[in-house]
Amino acid sequence: MGCDGGTIPKRHELVKGPKKVEKVDKDAELVAQWNYCTLSQEILRRPIVACELGRLYNKDAVIEFLLDKSAEKALGKAASHIKSIKNVTELKLSDNPAWEGDKGNTKGDKHDDLQRARFICPVVGLEMNGRHRFCFLRCCGCVFSERALKEIKAEVCHTCGAAFQEDDVIMLNGTKEDVDVLKTRMEERRLRAKLEKKTKKPKAAESVSKPDVSEEAPGPSKVKTGKPEEASLDSREKKTNLAPKSTAMNESSSGKAGKPPCGATKRSIADSEESEAYKSLFTTHSSAKRSKEESAHWVTHTSYCF
């Protein structure tokens, strides 16, 4: 309490000053960034994905976040920019052979080495514990250290050989300046994709609205519906049918009665080589002929029926 004798109070005990900003433990922050999911705060487990800003997530947590359509869903800063599963890239990580995991400290009587990491750079061998800068390629998902990217300059991936550009390199858990640069790139990339999608839609609509020119153009039909032999037979039959008509017209115009052409003579179906079932369809067949006694008295017939 003070001021009751025997105590000498100090100034900071009596006068309230500005509160000191609590410093975050750097080691604890690095462990949280590189070992835990940014969205669900659970330990990272395969499959591990990364967004366009370089943050690490569990793929299951991202899928659950996208499927959750409830109004109570908290849209935090960690996942507000993720609109679909295409906005994240599945990472291809290289395991650290020296990593023991939780097996080395099952009893809890050993010190946890925070410098030890689960994954390493496949090119240089640096551990991915936050002490070294790591990046991944958006085109293939391979992860390696920034030192490997600077020391071995190439236009293809160091692990899988896929070609990449400068915009495909995304820094994992970068600084504030790195996040700002990645955010501008992300916005430009999405705007470019929207413009390309809009330009593709009118082209598709024009192709549907405009029919083919070959369909509207007048001309002889090029469609063949049968064999060439059948087409030649049809043309011959048409010629034979047109020939008697032309001769009949010439005779009527000249006023001379001539003999009917040989093709115009009547031919009985009984003389043909067709089957009896086919011949029975005509009135000239024997089954169609009836005597006067068998035929009804009220039915009238013309001369050509029998």
Swiss-Prot record:
Post-translational modification comment from the UniProt entry: Undergoes proteasomal degradation, via DDI1 and DDI2. Removal from stalled replisomes and degradation are required for genome stability.
Entry GO terms, CC: nucleus; replication fork
InterPro entries xref list: Rtf2, Rtf2_RING-finger
Residue ranges with Polar residues bias: 243-255
Cellular localisation: Chromosome
MF terms in GO: DNA binding
Region described as Disordered: spans on this chain: 193-276
Compositional bias segments (type: Basic and acidic residues): 226-240
Residues where Phosphoserine is found: 287
Subunit structure: Interacts with DDI2; probably also interacts with DDI1.
Function per UniProt: Replication termination factor which is a component of the elongating replisome. Required for ATR pathway signaling upon DNA damage and has a positive activity during DNA replication. Might function to facilitate fork pausing at replication fork barriers like the rDNA. May be globally required to stimulate ATR signaling after the fork stalls or encounters a lesion. Interacts with nascent DNA.
Protein known as: Replication termination factor 2
